[in-house]
Amino acid sequence: MKTIYSTLALLVVIATSLHAQDTATHQSNAGIKGGYNLSAVSFDGDGETGQRHGFHIGVYGESFISESFSIQPELLYSQQGYEIKDANGTFTQKLDYINLPILLKAYPSKNFYLEAGPQIGLAISHKEEYNGLFSSSQEYDPNNFDWGMNFGGGFKTGSGITLGVRYHLGLGDLYDQGKAHNRVWQFSVGFDL
């Protein structure tokens, strides 16, 4: 009889342990991420420009503040900018940023998350290219500081691999004259370290 009770107790302990592993809470972590950028600029009154293709790469740290919520600061290098095409040629504004987003992440389920939060950015380089019939001597000098909001979501595996999509809604003026704001779609892959 003692053997039966001991065996039952052992089975209960094993079953509880397996269940706890299956429903384990999220753990704070750090990692690297990178991916594809699709960026444009919204000019007030003139609509949105053509898109520039680029990439982003950087590091993140995720700290859980409850079972379903975390805060994730990131430090990213990001290629942004825009393109304008007309009958005479193509103008491309290439802007490279160091961005610092701070995101609140919500996990409605174990693997899916939604995120939102502010971002500040510092332009570290800019370059203008004009390919067409006539060359342009006009200089565009963008502001060095950018800020805005990010919104996104994604999927995170139990092994720490993340697939995410994010939209950056720039709120800072890109140029001193006129209203122009960054708009960036980011498609990312991240790896917890």
What spans do the regions from the language model cover?
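Transmembrane beta-strands of outer-membrane beta-barrel pores
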Residues: Y36-A40, S63, Y77-G81, I120-I124, ...
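Outer-membrane beta-barrel translocator domains and adjoining extracellular loop/strand segments
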Residues: S42-E48, E83-T90, H126-L133, L174-H181
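Outer-membrane beta-barrel "beta-signal"
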Residues: N37, G152-I161, H181-L193
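Outer-membrane beta-barrel architecture
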Residues: G58-Y60, P101-L103, G152, S188-G190
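Residues that define the transmembrane beta-barrel architecture of outer-membrane proteins
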Residues: H26-S28, T49-F55, K94-I98, N143-M149, ...
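Cleavable N-terminal export/targeting peptides
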Residues: M1-H26
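Outer-membrane beta-barrel channels and translocator barrels
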Residues: T25, S66, Y107-S109, G158
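Repeated loop/turn-to-beta-strand initiation elements of outer-membrane beta-barrel proteins
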Residues: S68-I71, F112-L114, S159-V165
